[in-house]
Amino acid sequence: MAIQRTFSIIKPDATKRNLTGQIAAKFEEAGLRIVASKRIQLTLAQAQAFYGVHSERPFFGELCEFMISEPIVVQVLEGEDAIVKNREVMGATNPADAAPGTIRKEFALSIGENSVHGSDAPETAAEEIAFFFSGLELVG
């Protein structure tokens, strides 16, 4: 198994409820290292650019408004099979379908306010990391 990096967002519903530390602990307990992290307030333009792949979907506007409603925490996670491991720790997109002990099962409010985002493939991880971090900010 190879050491990988993946991208994670702790979303507004979770930061608003002060869950950042508990969510970060779940990543670390799963063997993922946080090699970059920052709390930011997205602008509408940034949210629209980041989620541009969804621009034609009916939920795009609502998603962007949600993502600018409160600060978010963007992170780069590193570890063996980090992308798969992160997705396992997050749980299913719909918290009703998420396994016990996962972030979404424990903390998500709904399918829309599901507390976290994680990259789904090496290519998207690289793009998403580069959107928020310079190489100098990645320490590990």
UniProtKB/Swiss-Prot annotation:
ATP binds at K11, F59, R87, T93, R104, N114. It is an enzyme of class 2 (transferase). SUPFAM superfamilies: Nucleoside diphosphate kinase, NDK. Coiled coil: none annotated. It is found in: Cytoplasm. InterPro entries: NDK-like_dom (IPR034907), NDK-like_dom_sf (IPR036850), Nucleoside_diP_kinase (IPR001564), Nucleoside_diP_kinase_AS (IPR023005). Its cofactor is Mg(2+). The active site is at H117. It holds the Pfam family NDK. Homotetramer. Belongs to the NDK family. This is Nucleoside diphosphate kinase. It comes from Jannaschia sp. (strain CCS1).
